């Protein structure tokens, strides 16, 4: 977060940070000076803050490394994982479930589109796959409501959907093994 967050991240990441907005997220990577991937992530904006979603096993090392380059930038790099919860939903009836939960009609089939409601951010990957982002305070009520219409299957299923969608996930074991252009980020 901070007033220099976007320019700072633009100089550090492989993606065009200027393309993210309150309505659009994107995938990117954080690389070594030689261009090898240290992390792959999902990046989006909420209010004036940029959020980077990456594997928990890389969080501390990426946060520490980015902090080294802050210098005089008006940027704060913090771990928000105790504040926000992500829930993935997938299936043929996701659009109907979205409408039931939010009371809104899904108006965009553009991938990586974000819709914000009072309590939930909805990241639309496709008509059949979404991620809900909510506060830890709101998560139990949202989970209860979702459970009335959907069956919890766990992170393994979500990881499989990521693989099937061609979304690269860099883990500690695969750091520096890939270049972003080989992984479409």
Question: What would you call each of these model-derived segments?
Answer:
Residues 1-184:
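Basic, glycine/lysine-rich polyanion-binding surfaces/domains
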């Amino acid at each position: 977060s901070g007033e220099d967050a976007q320019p700072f991240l633009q100089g550090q990441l492989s993606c065009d940070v200027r393309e993210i907005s309150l309505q659009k997220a994107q995938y990117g990577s954080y690389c070594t000076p030689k261009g090898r991937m240290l992390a792959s992530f999902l990046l989006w904006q909420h209010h004036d803050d940029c959020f980077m979603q990456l594997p928990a096993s890389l969080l501390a090392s990426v946060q520490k490394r980015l902090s080294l380059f802050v210098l005089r930038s008006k940027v704060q790099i913090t771990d928000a994982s105790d504040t926000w919860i992500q829930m993935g939903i997938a299936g043929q009836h996701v659009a109907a479930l979205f409408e039931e939960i939010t009371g809104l009609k899904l108006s965009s089939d553009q991938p990586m589109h974000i819709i914000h409601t009072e309590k939930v951010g909805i990241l639309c990957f496709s008509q059949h796959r979404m991620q809900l982002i909510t506060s830890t305070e709101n998560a139990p009520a949202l989970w209860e409501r979702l459970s009335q219409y959907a069956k919890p299957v766990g992170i393994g299923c979500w990881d499989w959907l990521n693989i099937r969608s061609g979304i690269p996930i860099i883990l500690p074991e695969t750091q520096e093994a890939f270049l972003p252009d080989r992984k479409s980020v």
